[in-house]
Amino acid sequence: MKKWVLSALLLLLLVACGENGQVNEEQESNAVDSQTEENESTEDAEEEDVPASTNEEPAENEEYEEKQTEEDTGTIDKEETDSELKEPQYIVNESNWALEPISDANPEVVLLTIDDAPDRYALEMAAILKELNVKAIFFVNGHFLETEEEQNALKEIHAMGFPIGNHTMTHKSLRQLSEEEQYEEIVLLSDKVEEIIGERPRFFRAPFGTNTDYAQELVKQEGMILMNWTYGFDWETEYMDAEALANVMVNTEYLSSGSNLLMHDREWTKDALADIVKGLQAKNYEILDPDLIGTDEAASELE
């Protein structure tokens, strides 16, 4: 009897232990599953919290930085190029009105200038020079800028790349005018030119080459370069012929390094222009780009 009771108690004890082990295993399994689900849920939540564009931002930033770098580099290059283009290489010698190199610039140059524009032939003359790939200064008068046609001609000349000079409003001798009248002749023309082409003239030439102290100071205040000429012939009767004019302009004894050639808006000058340019080039003279002419102050800064 005792054996049977002990056996029954032992059996009950074993059953109880087995159930507890199963419960513990289930609890542990549930705990592990719960932790796994919690971790997966946490990871999912972290992935959802990160914006979808995050992975794209570095690429966008790199693209932006690359673009910005290219733009910055382009700006610097452009500024350096503009600076180089604007750096003067020649000045006007006011004792003889020739062009002088500032440092190691080519001394064998001549400057072409055309006065009294745009009367009748200036636009054609500009087209001829453009075709020959050379430049000249077109000195304009206010009384040739009164009509829309004349103003459009000036716009076209400027658009072709030719610098514009101030030759006064009405071509009167400055020495016969009061200071107030001189001011009007000079400044009002610069105002008019700016109104037409968007910029003021860089050069000034007085009618008949006669300046006054007041006019010279005013020109300086206006930031213009004072200029006369070294030689010219097209107003003389014997040279009012294209062939004769071309011959004297190229073969005169006055031609030398830095010569400042004066011509006018005239039919015979227009017809002689190509031969003048080619004749000068045949003598190994370079036609000077007026954009390379600076002031004495600019030259001093470079020294």
Could you describe each region identified by the protein language model?
Residues 172-197, 208-256:
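Alpha-helical scaffold elements lining the catalytic groove of polysaccharide deacetylases
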Residues 78-173, 192:
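Active-site beta->alpha N-cap acidic-glycine motif
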Residues 116-120, 141-149, 173-177, 205-211, ...:
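Acidic-and-aromatic substrate-binding clefts and catalytic sites of carbohydrate-active enzymes
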Residues 6, 11, 18-107:
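N-terminal, intrinsically disordered, polar/charged segments of Gram-positive cell-envelope systems
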